[in-house]
Regions:
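Short acidic/glycine-enriched loop/turn segments that link adjacent beta-strands
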Residues: 94-96
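Proline- and acidic/polar-enriched loop/turn elements at helix boundaries
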Residues: 63, 89-90
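Glycine-rich phosphate/adenosyl-contacting loop at the front of the ribokinase-like
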Residues: 1-63, 68-82
Length: 160
């Protein structure tokens, strides 16, 4: 029997969401938000968090910086029951990614600093770990700049 129900490889970052902004974002002006929240972001991490919260056994592989955003991202996943033992923490000048969402009444701007998201590479992955599940999930491949050329090799080898 596989160790996990689902293993996931992908991006890991937090979302900073600002609410109550004016409809027009004027240049060179400080704009005041009514409220904000800092929450787990990135589609792969949100899927992992939600599946684990529903009782699935979830293994997660990604890359974060050795910084506050990376530690907080890992904490949030671990609190929901996601196995984060294979997330690589790197000590480099590249920090953990962050998405800033400027929420307006009827629309939003989404700004992402890629950081370590783009640097997730083939060498960061443990293929045996990923294959030890009933289902493998990969998300946001367009953001995974380093891994993208080798994704075709990853998918056939990940079948359980």
């Amino acid at each position: 029997m596989p160790r996990f129900d689902v293993t996931i490889a992908g991006e890991l970052n937090l979302d900073l969401i600002l609410y109550g902004l004016p409809e027009q974002l004027l240049p060179e002006r400080e704009l005041i938000a009514d409220r904000m929240t800092l929450t787990l972001g990135s589609s792969s991490a949100i899927v992992a968090h939600n599946l684990a919260s529903l009782g699935s056994r979830v293994g997660f592989q990604s890359r974060v910086g050795e910084d506050h955003l990376g530690r907080l991202s890992l904490e949030r996943l671990e609190q929901s029951g996601v196995d984060i033992s294979k997330v690589r923490t790197v000590n480099s000048s590249t920090t953990t990614g962050l998405t800033v969402i400027l929420h307006h009444q009827t629309w939003r701007n989404i700004l992402t600093y890629m950081g370590t998201i783009a640097d997730l590479s083939w060498e960061d992955l443990d293929l045996d770990y990923l294959a030890d599940s009933r289902h493998f999930h990969l998300s946001s491949y367009y953001m995974l700049r380093e891994l993208r050329p080798r994704i075709p090799e990853l998918c056939p080898g990940a079948t359980a």
